[in-house]
């Protein structure tokens, strides 16, 4: 007998309803629904995926803490342009603790109102010069100038790639693969992902598909983030 799916359509309905009723009074009245539709399925997915990522590298953090493995539903509106109180998406992410809480690469999967995404991402964090992008990825790309092009050839047909720089203090998105070594002197983030319809997450084989994705993109994390 096939295993029960981790997620149901109720997860996506909850995010859509939250988007229409993004107020504390609504969220407080629907906490039980949030737990059943979002929190519990994501914790089950962590249990399913932890052995997979630990097989790739046993230094991955799989402790199940909010912030470390799970994104926060509450939005920090102090500095955000979007002043809505709650995010209409949730992420499960795996990364390896770095010295001084240095920003590092992640394997991740996210569900939102109408989309599922999964893959690899790395950001510079608040201090780029102290991030894995600056200390690990940039010098490696300068030493192996064809590495990104090889990853594009390996993954480009199945995965989307985009990256960010800052221009005049604003984040600027660049579609495609950062194949030029000079790109890595200013890159602030890089994402390589698969984008799927909600139905992908409601299938019993979803964890198996995630395992395949994580194995395929793990070399990106290893190259850009692990000293």
What are these model-predicted stretches?
Residues 75-140:
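Aromatic- and glycine-enriched beta-alpha-beta binding-site module
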Residues 111-175:
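Compact, glycine/acidic-enriched structural inserts
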Residues 153, 175-202:
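A solvent-exposed interaction/effector surface
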Residues 1-29, 223-227:
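Short, charged, low-complexity amphipathic alpha-helix
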Residues 25-44, 48, 212, 216:
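A non-catalytic, amphipathic alpha-helix used as a structural packing/dimerization or gating element
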Residues 193-227:
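C-terminal edge-of-domain segments
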Residues 19-33, 101-104, 108-112:
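Hydrophobic/aromatic-rich, well-ordered segments within soluble, folded domains that form packed cores
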Residues 35-82:
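Gly/Pro-rich turn-and-neighbor structural signature
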């Amino acid at each position: 007998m096939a295993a029960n799916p981790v997620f149901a359509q109720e997860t996506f309905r909850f995010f859509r309803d939250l988007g229409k009723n993004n107020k504390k009074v609504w969220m407080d009245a629907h906490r039980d629904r949030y737990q059943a539709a979002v929190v519990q399925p994501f914790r089950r997915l962590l249990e399913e995926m932890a052995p997979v990522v630990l097989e790739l590298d046993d230094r991955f953090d799989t402790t199940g803490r909010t912030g470390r493995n799970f994104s926060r539903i509450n939005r920090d509106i102090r500095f955000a342009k979007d002043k809505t109180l709650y995010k209409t998406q949730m992420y499960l992410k795996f990364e390896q603790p770095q010295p001084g809480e240095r920003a590092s690469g992640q394997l991740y999967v996210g569900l939102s109102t109408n989309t599922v995404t999964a893959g690899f991402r790395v950001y510079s964090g608040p201090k780029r010069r102290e991030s894995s992008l600056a200390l690990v990825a940039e010098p490696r790309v300068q030493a192996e100038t064809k590495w990104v092009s090889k990853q594009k050839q390996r993954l480009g047909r199945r995965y989307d790639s985009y990256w960010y720089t800052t221009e005049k203090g604003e984040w600027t998105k660049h579609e495609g693969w950062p194949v030029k070594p000079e790109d890595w002197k200013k890159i602030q983030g890089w994402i390589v992902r698969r984008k799927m319809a909600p139905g992908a997450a409601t299938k019993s084989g979803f964890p198996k598909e995630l395992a395949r994705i994580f194995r395929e993109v793990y070399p990106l994390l290893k190259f850009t983030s692990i000293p």
